[in-house]
Amino acid sequence: TGNSNLQPAAMTLTATATVNPACGAYVTAPMDFGVNTGAVASNIDRTARFSLTCVNRSPFQVGLDNGSHADGAGNRRMRVGSSGALLPYELYRDAARTQRWGNVLNSTTVSGTGTGAAQDLTIYGRVPPAAGTSTPPGAYTDTVTVTITY
């Protein structure tokens, strides 16, 4: 009842899966330079933090743009309402505030590798002393866009 001409056949099956890199972030502590009276007489240093979660072993770079009120040279400035009064400030990658945090890949960005868990990054901010005798009163603000490249 059997067929003696049957031969075993072998073939290969390839299993594949693709895991795309992915990152997500949210601000956990915004930059707040506090309340000041009159001219800024000395550096005001503060920090902000945000949390970044990227897929395990995914390389990433985090960049910051110059903000909504930067001048033509890219210097960051906060503005009070629609009055036009501006207050210069800067954002840095290091606690010594010597490495400006920008948006140029492999140069002024912060790079790292995802772990699959939340990683906290700190932004170091500084408002330098004012050149004039007083700073017009008001609530100064700016909006900086954070870009995550992965």
Positions of the model-derived regions?
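Intrinsically disordered, low-complexity sequence elements enriched in Ser/Thr/Gly/Pro
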Residues: 74-77, 91, 98
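Predominantly extracellular/luminal cell-surface or secreted proteins
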Residues: 65-67, 90-94
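Solvent-exposed adhesion/ligand-recognition segments of exported proteins
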Residues: 97-106
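Solvent-exposed strand-loop boundary residues in beta-sheet-rich modules
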Residues: 95-97, 150
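N-terminal small/polar-rich segments of proteins
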Residues: 1-83, 109-150
